[in-house]
């Protein structure tokens, strides 16, 4: 299974994470398929994500980890995936 998860970078006591697409059998910091962005918790939650690539990978079947899913919700990735899969909600115009 392909997962979207965080891989740790940075120095000791200065964590920095990449958001990567990886085979679930690989190690946490092992080889990955593609990097989608980064997350720096020390700089007030500095986050950068390639939203289009993230949506593509989720539509292909990649499963985000719990932490990555929360980050994606902040950027509207999960909402965009839902709209593509199930269509936008039509507003009721009954008058």
Swiss-Prot record:
One of its GO terms (cellular component) is cytoplasm. Keywords: Ribonucleoprotein, Ribosomal protein. Pfam families: Ribosomal_S16. PROSITE patterns: RIBOSOMAL_S16 (PS00732). InterPro entries: Ribosomal_bS16, Ribosomal_bS16_CS, Ribosomal_bS16_dom_sf. One of its GO terms (biological process) is translation. One of its GO terms (molecular function) is structural constituent of ribosome. SUPFAM superfamilies: Ribosomal protein S16 (SSF54565). It comes from the Bacteria. Belongs to the bacterial ribosomal protein bS16 family. This is Small ribosomal subunit protein bS16.
